[in-house]
Amino acid sequence: MAREYIGKYIRWLNPHNPTRSYFLDRMQLSKPLVRGVGHHLYDVEGVEYLDFLSQYGAVSFGHNHPELWAALAACAQEQLPAMIQPLVPVAAQQLAAKLAAVTPGDLGITVFTNSGAEAVEAAIKLARARTGRPTILSTINGFHGKTLGALSATGNLTYQVLFGAPSPHFDYVPYGDAAALEAVLEKDADQIAAFILEPIQGEAGVIPAPPGYIATALELCRRHGVLSIVDEIQTGLGRTGALFGLPAEAGTPDILVLAKALGGGLVPIGACITTPDAWDHRFGALHSSTFANGNLVARVGLCALDILLRDDQQIVRHVAKNGAYLLQRLRELQAAYPRVIRDVRGAGYLAGLDFFPFDGDDSYTMAFFSKNDYLIAFFASYLFNVHHLVTAPVFNNSHVLRLEPPFTVGPAEIDRAIAALGALCDTLDRKDYYHLVRHLPGEAVTRVPGHRRFAAPNAPNPLPAPTQSVGPRKSFAFLVHYTELRDFVACDPSFTQFTAEELDRWRDWVQWSEPGLVYNLLQVRSRTGAVADGCLIGLPMLPADISRRGRRRMLPMLGDALTLAQSQGARIVGLGGFTSIVSKGAQSLVGKGVAVTSGNVLTTVMALEGIADVTRRLELSLPAMHTAVVGATGAIGRLASLLLADRVAGLTLIGNPRSRDALVRCRIVAGEIYARLMGRAKVTPPPVASPIDRQLREVLGPLLTTPLLRLTAAQVPLARALHEQRVVDDDGYERLARTVETAFAAAGRDAPIAFATDLRKAELPADLVFVATNSDASLIAADALTAGAVVCDVARPPNVAREVVESRDDVLVFEGGLVELPEPVHFGPNLLGFRPGIMLGCLAETVLLALEGDDRDHSIGPRLDPAEAEYLRVLAERHGVRAAPPHCCGVELGEEDFAKRQRAHAALRVELAVDKGDSATGRSVTGRSA
């Protein structure tokens, strides 16, 4: 499942195809099956499984058919030479004669191969030799094998591009479209050697040819002198309820290829069978294979044909009769679950169950499986582990379950399979996805599923209105991950059934998934009429998981997420949560072929607009509020400090207590603030200057504007230091901050910016607390906050402990950085449960840039620019993007919440006024001064 990560952060050293073995192990499909009898398989513990796959149709007669083994045993008894090329293989000649007798028309010359893909290769070579033309025409989504020529004829780029396929001279037409075929033949027949097609496109989703299509196609080929190749590797020899899938009215193709059932499930063998007119002696002289034409495999092939033809093809008639019953039962299942099963297709014992895709509205987990081509593998895992039914996906359609049982199954086995599929469909219909995934972490399933029905968190977004496309497509992608354990349930309501232990195992399992699509938003509209579309790319892990994995192992994963975003057409990619942190505010991902943003600038801007709204509703004066910024040296905390300095009475910058240079780093931020404000101290003050600005003007203004000769002896060194200050790096900012502090001390005043590493130890109580750390822990407890404090918590997950909300009615806590779009769109469960239209600022910045068509990098690194903040603020205003109403713990705050805070704070003030002792000490009942 994590193919690209082997060697990056997953060490999976199985010597037998580690990629596939990792996938099978991860999907709980690696259980050793040690015994097979008929249509039953058994594991090492003796548990029985019903085989409804028969190795993609190769085990048509069931496992270990006694007659087939007897044919092999007879070879040993007779001491028949197994391989004697270039001499005459007697059994191979006998098998060729028998095939000539049973195949349609005058198909009578056989070249044996070791597999179906090699049979297709032989057919391609023969057609080119016979016609002298290079081009092989095949169908879109056809499947003919994985050797290079057969792969080139396979009309699916997924399997081709890595291997330099398709090779030159391959072309494709839509399957079932005779008019398209005729048009190509009319135009290019003189270059086309052959047209290859399947009676049923098995790997495309078990798609039967439209009535009359095969006959028309073969007739068109005859008319234009192009050879026809019918690929019956999967459909031939009884699979469809007839000896061949080729309709009788179609006539005889020039070449027919067989494999799978011909080997009886014991030996690999393929056959390229041609008419005399299509045969070419040059091909016969030059084409050979060391291991083909062996007597051993030919004896098995002869026995397989005997079983098929016995009693007037009794086993084939059995497949026809019971295949009709299988399709009937599947269609009954579709009728019972019309929201689950999209279609049922097939013939005989080759059936496809086509499931509706999952869009993410009701489950990010199911959308992750669905959008990233793992849905049917996941269903097959559930059926195997819970119901002991062996199935598999088709190769070219990630939503079709293949049902391809051995010919030996009857009505009882079909009913058992339908019961298992019914349980799957019922669970899907009830959205009880917990009961589908709980086996994946390796838990033995013991609890019986209930019958609870779960609802999607949001109704689907309305279909987008038609728009007139102007200019390039505006598209974005955004990387998301879980922020708290409760997010697992928010995204998948049925996960409430997980026990704590189960959820822990699920978390551990899912975190090793590669980045994958979880939601597609078809349209988001600006107030200007601009339109963009986008997608969410999920990294299903918690912040602690990302932190443990570290930058070295996370960056390749994020690089793959960017590649996925580009494949979806994204022009800007936003980094949510800890994906921004681990990439140094997107700095490590710049220059990777697509624009990136950490989203930190708009998050900060909207957090400050939220503060303005909350303080207005509480009738508080922001310029009178001393403000603490917790996480002041981080990207958001630093930018917020720079911008808040224009609005509040004073600042306390709180650094990381675990960092030895925390106070130095805080002083550097203070130096940046002072440098920004000092330029204003030399000019006429604005009509409304901030308190910090006024203080700097009062203390530094004289030092900056008064000639040195008119200053006191004590002032001269400070004035010279300020004039000579050259701020070009962190050391310069730190020196500037120290100079400002000295100047304020000389004036007998405290500097307007203080520092601490703990909110409790700050010199001044904070009326407003802005929290924006990179920690995934709760850092702000109830006893750290002054009475009546307002707390803006930007951190994800929140840094303010839930007990603050539950125990401190006098304190108002709200989630900072939330944004409201002009229209109420959502991204499925919206992860954090907000109502449609409301989202995190980092996501909103990504959407905003897409709407604007701005595909430059933004919000990069730790030093965010106030000028960029102003640019995005103006952009947001133009497009109708604004700060969301304040929320706390995912719930929108109402007027009663504000009134409750006012009442509680007023009661505390009365209590403090009455309590003389506390008044004397200046301490409140909370342990912080009022």
Please provide the spans of the model-predicted regions.
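Short, conserved loop/helix-junction motifs that constitute active-site signature segments
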Residues: 250, 782-787, 805-808
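Glycine/serine-rich phosphate-binding loop and adjoining beta1-alpha1 elements at the start
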Residues: 521-623, 828-833, 840
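Rossmann-fold NAD(P) dinucleotide-binding segment
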Residues: 708, 726, 774-789
